[in-house]
Amino acid sequence: MTATSSPRPKQISTDPCISLQNVTISYNEFEAVRHVYCEIPRGKITALIGPSGCGKSTILRSLNRMNDLIEGCSLTGRVMFDGDDLYSPNIDPVEVRRRIGMVFQQPNPFPKSIYENIAFGARINGYKGDMNELVERSLRQAAVWDECKDKLKESGCSLSGGQQQRLCIARTIAIEPEVILMDEPCSALDPISTLKIEETMHELKNRFTIVIVTHNMQQAVRVSDFTAFFNAEVQEGGSGKVGYLVEFNETEKIFHSPAQEATQNYISGRFG
């Protein structure tokens, strides 16, 4: 299978939350990922896996227009969310990022108190309810309330790495998104903190659609319902590699009976 001949995948979900339709993303003249068709199921966890440089983080950032912040980045095709093309001129990217939140690879709490890490974003987004209740609910949903409830006035930066990442998840939850994107959220964490994040993700999927990029295939098996495998190949002329979607299916099928040889080779460790 080549990047220029990737077939349109079969429909996986009858209730897609986000649909990528022939999406190609470029940085100036360089194509990073090409011709992606994919439907992200609602209320599930979808993992994006593949070797470094295959475009999975680029695709993840396209789902809430974070790539807009990168100079020279452009997208063709359509990213549909609840019937709207997110790249339509009349769509406000700030509102897109409120409805589709992001948790980054490195924990990045605000240099504020734990309380204000949660309250600040909600406040600037016009939240009018009981702020104390929102802070507690968000921290509980991110499974960090018990560790923070007695030190809400302390800096969020004083927490451990795993606690900081769960604080960032709580901060994302507080603005009441419909989708949460996670870009390798456990790569900087120890195994115990990773387990807590994964347990939190399982709880959150009852309320949110989650899309996660991970290099850890065991993590993809543990947490995701669906998996998209991306690969990359050298472009004509040898000017770099372009990423493309090889296969998208239920996680169990991807890891136990993949349809593509490249998927089997990757999950068995023959490359990557």
UniProtKB/Swiss-Prot annotation:
ABC transporter domain span: 18-256
Location within or outside the cell: Cell inner membrane
Keyword Cytoplasm: no
Binding site for ATP: 50-57
InterPro entries: AAA+_ATPase (IPR003593), ABC_transporter-like_ATP-bd (IPR003439), ABC_transporter-like_CS (IPR017871), P-loop_NTPase (IPR027417), PstB-like (IPR005670)
Top-tier EC class: translocase
Signal peptide positions on this chain: none
CDD domains reported in the protein's UniProt record: ABC_PstB_phosphate_transporter
Keyword entries, A-Z: ATP-binding, Cell inner membrane, Cell membrane, Membrane, Nucleotide-binding, Phosphate transport, Translocase, Transport
Top-level taxon: Bacteria
Primary location: membrane
Reactions listed under catalytic activity: phosphate(out) + ATP + H2O = ADP + 2 phosphate(in) + H(+)
PANTHER family: ABC TRANSPORTER I FAMILY MEMBER 17 (PTHR43423:SF1)
Family named by the database record: Belongs to the ABC transporter superfamily. Phosphate importer (TC 3.A.1.7) family.
Main function: Part of the ABC transporter complex PstSACB involved in phosphate import. Responsible for energy coupling to the transport system.
UniProt-listed NCBIfam families: 3a0107s01c2 (TIGR00972)
Protein name: Phosphate import ATP-binding protein PstB
Organism the protein comes from: Prochlorococcus marinus (strain MIT 9313)
Phylogenetic placement of the source organism: Bacteria, Bacillati, Cyanobacteriota, Cyanophyceae, Synechococcales
